């Protein structure tokens, strides 16, 4: 029985990462370069070109308007994939299909990319920040990456597993408008107490401006982040009590055409 259980676990992992094709028996794996490009493109906030407006800050989970990444083709893979030894084995493919809105092929592509960047099967905060910094070589993305990491780390154990990763991506890329707004609210609610304060939003905005870098906006005024926060609260804090609740956040976003239009940027990313 013990040997059989181990065999099933290994089979699930091979099935998930696409290390063999059930029909041909051949490994379809992509090259490391292709995996890295795919993995990076799948994280939110891919290559923004401008500082966000209020509506963009509210609409995009990464607070910045991303460009549309190249569509992933799960079938365009090479024949030279070397399996990595993973310490954390993800849940079975069928279970992840039920829990997310990704297809079998998409999950396999995602897993190969995740395992290439994170051979242990999990990513800690420091590794996450290192990966994320590749988006913004001109600035300091470490603080914002910490906020984003905490949003993916839903059980607060200090690591993001593949299950955590695809659960977050499923909401961002395939979730309903309400799903995405709830995810964005959770990102901005830094202490997870159910409301966004001006201090929290100021920390978010400062991290975004730091991430963009002074070389992108050399003439940026020091008070710009605080002004952005005031604009945010003027739009969102409907009862003027100094905090934004999830109800205020969702209601305000749903009434803003620009925000709703921005939410569609994440459709069909993969």
UniProtKB/Swiss-Prot annotation:
Component of heteromultimeric potassium channels. Identified in potassium channel complexes containing KCND1, KCND2, KCND3, KCNIP1, KCNIP2, KCNIP3, KCNIP4, DPP6 and DPP10. The KCND2-KCNIP2 channel complex contains four KCND2 and four KCNIP2 subunits. Interacts with KCND2. Probably part of a complex consisting of KCNIP1, KCNIP2 isoform 3 and KCND2. At least isoform 2 and isoform 3 can self-associate to form homodimers and homotetramers. Isoform 3 interacts with KCNIP1 in a calcium-dependent manner. Residues 1-17 have a biased composition (Basic and acidic residues). CDD domains: EFh. Palmitoylated. Palmitoylation enhances association with the plasma membrane. One of its GO terms (biological process) is regulation of membrane repolarization. Coiled coil: none annotated. The gene is KCNIP2. The modification Phosphoserine is found at residue 9. GO terms for molecular function: calcium ion binding; ER retention sequence binding; identical protein binding; potassium channel activity; potassium channel regulator activity; protein-containing complex binding; transmembrane transporter binding. Belongs to the recoverin family. The keyword Ion transport applies. A lipid is attached at residues 45-46 (S-palmitoyl cysteine). Expressed in brain. Colocalizes with KCND2 in excitatory neurons including cortical and hippocampal CA1 pyramidal cells. Isoform 3 is expressed in heart and in umbilical vein endothelial cells. Not expressed in fetal heart. Keywords: Calcium, Cell membrane, Ion channel, Ion transport, Lipoprotein, Membrane, Metal-binding, Palmitate, Phosphoprotein, Potassium, Potassium channel, Potassium transport, Repeat, Transport, Voltage-gated channel. This is A-type potassium channel modulatory protein KCNIP2. Ca(2+) 1 binds at residues 153, 155, 157, 159, 164.
């Amino acid at each position: 029985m013990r040997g059989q259980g181990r065999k099933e676990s290994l089979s699930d992992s091979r099935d998930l990462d696409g290390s063999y094709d059930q029909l041909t028996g051949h490994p379809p794996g992509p090259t490391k370069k292709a995996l890295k490009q795919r993995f990076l493109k799948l994280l939110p906030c891919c290559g923004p070109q401008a500082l966000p407006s209020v509506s963009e800050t509210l609409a995009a989970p990464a607070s910045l308007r991303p460009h549309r990444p190249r569509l992933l083709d799960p079938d365009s893979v090479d024949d030279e994939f070397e399996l990595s030894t993973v310490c954390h084995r993800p849940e079975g493919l069928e279970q992840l299909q039920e829990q997310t809105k990704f297809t079998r092929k998409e999950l396999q592509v995602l897993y190969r990319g995740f395992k290439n960047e994170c051979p242990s099967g999990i990513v800690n905060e420091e590794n996450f920040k290192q990966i994320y910094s590749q988006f913004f070589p001109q600035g300091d993305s470490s603080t914002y990456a910490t906020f984003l990491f905490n949003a993916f780390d839903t059980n607060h154990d200090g690591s993001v597993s593949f299950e955590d990763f695809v659960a977050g991506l499923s909401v961002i890329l395939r979730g309903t408008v309400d799903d995405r707004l709830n995810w964005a609210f959770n990102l901005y609610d830094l202490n997870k107490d159910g409301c966004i304060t001006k201090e929290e939003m100021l920390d978010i905005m400062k991290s975004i401006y730091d991430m963009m870098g002074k070389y992108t906006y050399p003439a940026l005024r020091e008070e710009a982040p605080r002004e952005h926060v005031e604009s945010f609260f003027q739009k969102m804090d409907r009862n003027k009590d100094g905090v934004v609740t999830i109800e205020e956040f969702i209601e305000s976003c749903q009434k803003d055409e620009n925000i709703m239009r921005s939410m569609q940027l994440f459709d069909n990313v993969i």
